């Protein structure tokens, strides 16, 4: 499969971006993956996306380790001990990031006005006003809300069950970051906390990234991070 890779410094991390041509994918490309048998029943598009994501992950891992991240029983990437990572893909782009802290990354295509109007009904009653106050086009702002929540979930996916969109509320949105207030539906041990997620636009997509403590955030001996407790 034809790919191009380039690294990008963002929010204190090194993102590894892989643009790929899914039409150039061949089944034998998967033989590079130790777990290729697990993908036997996947569709062609899914196989190409998975491969591109793992290529991005291998580039991201080279600073610390070698090899291809495996695949867990919930289809999650398996990272080396003491490392955290995240993979995302959208259309013809995949990206990955590795850190010694919890990290989550997401890429989403910016919604059309029609899609944003349809999906606006599922957000919290306070969120439309916050998104509109940002001065960003509403489709972009709503896409960022979805993407930021996905990034936060990825950072803690081993600790929480799959949360719904209403398990976190947008509290602010600027040209560089979006803040989320976590509710008990996200995880009881993380409720009433605020997460700041960094973002930037790349073409017709947005990329969001959150980095959090390796230890559970209520551990006051841990250093400060993007994830912080709101006043109690």
From Swiss-Prot:
GO terms for cellular component: enterobactin synthetase complex; plasma membrane. This is Enterobactin synthase component D. It comes from Salmonella austin. Coiled coil: none annotated. It catalyses: apo-[aryl-carrier protein] + CoA = holo-[aryl-carrier protein] + adenosine 3',5'-bisphosphate + H(+); apo-[peptidyl-carrier protein] + CoA = holo-[peptidyl-carrier protein] + adenosine 3',5'-bisphosphate + H(+). GO terms for biological process: enterobactin biosynthetic process. It holds the Pfam family ACPS. The keyword Magnesium applies. It is found in: Membrane. Its cofactor is Mg(2+). The keyword Nucleotidyltransferase does not apply. Keywords: Enterobactin biosynthesis, Magnesium, Membrane, Metal-binding, Transferase. Belongs to the P-Pant transferase superfamily. EntD family. InterPro entries: 4-PPantetheinyl_Trfase_dom, 4-PPantetheinyl_Trfase_dom_sf, 4PPT_N, Enbac_synth_compD-like. GO terms for molecular function: holo-[acyl-carrier-protein] synthase activity; magnesium ion binding. It is an enzyme of class 2 (transferase). Pathway: Siderophore biosynthesis; enterobactin biosynthesis. Mg(2+) binds at residues 106, 108, 150. Involved in the biosynthesis of the siderophore enterobactin (enterochelin), which is a macrocyclic trimeric lactone of N-(2,3-dihydroxybenzoyl)-serine. The serine trilactone serves as a scaffolding for the three catechol functionalities that provide hexadentate coordination for the tightly ligated iron(2+) atoms. Its main location: membrane. Gene3D superfamilies: 4'-phosphopantetheinyl transferase domain. Its EC number is 2.7.8.-. EntB, EntD, EntE, and EntF form a multienzyme complex called enterobactin synthase.
